[in-house]
Amino acid sequence: HASRATDGKKRRKRRKESYGIYIYKVLKQVHPDTGISSRAMSIMNSFVNDVFERIAGEASRLAQYNKKSTISSREVQTAVRLLLPGELAKHAVSEGTKAVTKYTTSK
């Protein structure tokens, strides 16, 4: 049985999903002339994944406590209020509300 490498068949590289393009777009909005190294991008990607998992976990717990089987924008908003400190939570909630409104009206 020949190994994959010597088989002549190209082994398709598994596409790794990341928030890279979105992080880059936000960077260009705030600092148009600033670049980002791949190491810094990797750190930012880990950060976004970490915050996403924390919010999702907290929202999941909130839904369970209230005997609900669905996470709604309300659970996510409460999770954000619990996880983020003061002013950061305020801004995150207003941006989230704005995004949900934009999504609802575009449907």
From Swiss-Prot:
Keyword Isomerase among record annotations: no
Location(s) in or outside the cell: Nucleus; Chromosome
Domain of life according to the entry: Eukaryota
Keyword Electron transport: no
One GO molecular-function entry: protein heterodimerization activity
Pfam family, one: Histone
Signal peptide residues on this chain, from the entry's feature table: none
Family, similarity comment: Belongs to the histone H2B family.
Subunit structure: The nucleosome is a histone octamer containing two molecules each of H2A, H2B, H3 and H4 assembled in one H3-H4 heterotetramer and two H2A-H2B heterodimers. The octamer wraps approximately 147 bp of DNA.
Protein name (Swiss-Prot/TrEMBL): Late histone H2B.L4
Originating species: Strongylocentrotus purpuratus (Purple sea urchin)
